[in-house]
């Protein structure tokens, strides 16, 4: 269920702003989105796993705050990122 180091590196390479970027807002949101998607799949199979559901809600809240920050800083980057990730239809 956890992200492998290889998958994390793929996400970083796809969303990094410059060569050594590992913690920009774009990368953080992409990582959280991947974790949210995996946890959502887990919860569809394990409906009674309430502690994981609580963790999912915390991750969604964190991503929501990061998206709000990105929207304030750069609306163009925000629009590009949400369309690239396929969130907020």
Swiss-Prot record:
Keywords: Ribonucleoprotein, Ribosomal protein, RNA-binding, rRNA-binding
CDD domains named in the record: Ribosomal_S15p_S13e
PROSITE patterns associated with the record: RIBOSOMAL_S15
InterPro entries assigned: Ribosomal_uS15 (IPR000589), Ribosomal_uS15_bac-type (IPR005290), uS15_NS1_RNA-bd_sf (IPR009068)
Sample GO molecular function, one term: structural constituent of ribosome
Subunit comment: Part of the 30S ribosomal subunit. Forms a bridge to the 50S subunit in the 70S ribosome, contacting the 23S rRNA.
Pfam families: Ribosomal_S15 (PF00312)
Superkingdom in the source lineage: Bacteria
GO biological process entries: translation
Record-level GO cellular component terms: cytosolic small ribosomal subunit
Transmembrane segments: none
Protein family (similarity comment): Belongs to the universal ribosomal protein uS15 family.
Protein name in UniProt: Small ribosomal subunit protein uS15
The protein's role, per its UniProt record: One of the primary rRNA binding proteins, it binds directly to 16S rRNA where it helps nucleate assembly of the platform of the 30S subunit by binding and bridging several RNA helices of the 16S rRNA. Forms an intersubunit bridge (bridge B4) with the 23S rRNA of the 50S subunit in the ribosome.
SUPFAM superfamilies per record: S15/NS1 RNA-binding domain (SSF47060)
Signal peptide range: none
């Amino acid at each position: 269920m956890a992200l492998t180091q290889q998958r994390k590196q793929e996400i970083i390479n796809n969303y990094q702003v410059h060569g050594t970027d590992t913690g920009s807002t774009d990368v953080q949101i992409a990582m959280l989105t991947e974790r949210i998607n995996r946890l959502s799949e887990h919860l569809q199979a394990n409906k009674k796993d309430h502690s994981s559901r609580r963790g999912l809600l915390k991750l969604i809240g964190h991503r929501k705050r990061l998206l709000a920050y990105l929207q304030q800083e750069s609306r163009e980057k925000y629009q590009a990122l949400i369309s690239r990730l396929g969130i907020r239809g």
